[in-house]
Design a protein with these regions (language model features):
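Acidic, surface-exposed loops and disordered segments
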Residues: 1-169
């Protein structure tokens, strides 16, 4: 399967099968941490696997949809790249997004579904899960097997025309 086909087939899963995620599958996903590009290859991204604390996580977001595993993506604020030209600009959130996208697409390749979650309170999550103060939570990602009746959202395949999204300089 080519990249474009893989990317088009991927969708946000909102209903997961009652089937555990095998450690081998999780390990294959986490290998993406080693190959995804990050600014200056500093690799400040951390992933916390949350299979054991799903009930605690359910108190912080309604977006788990029965997934057997949730990955939490953080970055180490002491290790991300800082832009010396513009203060306050650093790479942590971008690095996390790149790694998370790699994991999301690898999951699709492996026959797994994912849900990218931004609908949670990062500070409350950091407190509830004792995230070190030098790490910042960026997103959560559900991972598991999609239920047989799971399907893409109604607007999944709708896109704006390309000329509305591209500006040539």
């Amino acid at each position: 399967m080519g990249f474009m086909e893989l990317a088009k087939e991927r969708y946000t899963v909102r209903k997961y099968a009652d089937k555990p995620l095998e450690k081998e599958q999780l390990d294959k996903l986490l290998e993406c941490l080693l190959i995804a590009p990050t600014a200056k290859n500093l690799q400040p991204v951390r992933v916390i696997e949350g299979e054991k604390n799903l009930a605690k996580l359910d108190e912080l977001t309604k977006c788990r949809y029965g997934a057997p595993c949730v990955l939490a993506f953080t970055y180490n604020k002491d290790e991300d790249w800082k832009n010396s030209i513009e203060s306050g600009f650093h790479s942590g959130e971008q690095d996390v997004s790149i790694v998370a996208t790699h994991i999301m697409l690898r999951a699709q390749e492996l026959g797994l579904g994912t849900t990218w979650i931004n609908w949670y309170a990062p500070v409350a999550f950091e407190r509830a899960f004792d995230i070190p103060v030098n790490e910042s939570s960026v997103l959560l990602m559900c991972v598991g097997y999609a239920a047989d009746d799971a399907h893409p959202a109604r607007m999944h395949s709708e896109t704006r025309p390309l000329d509305e999204m591209v500006r040539y300089l």
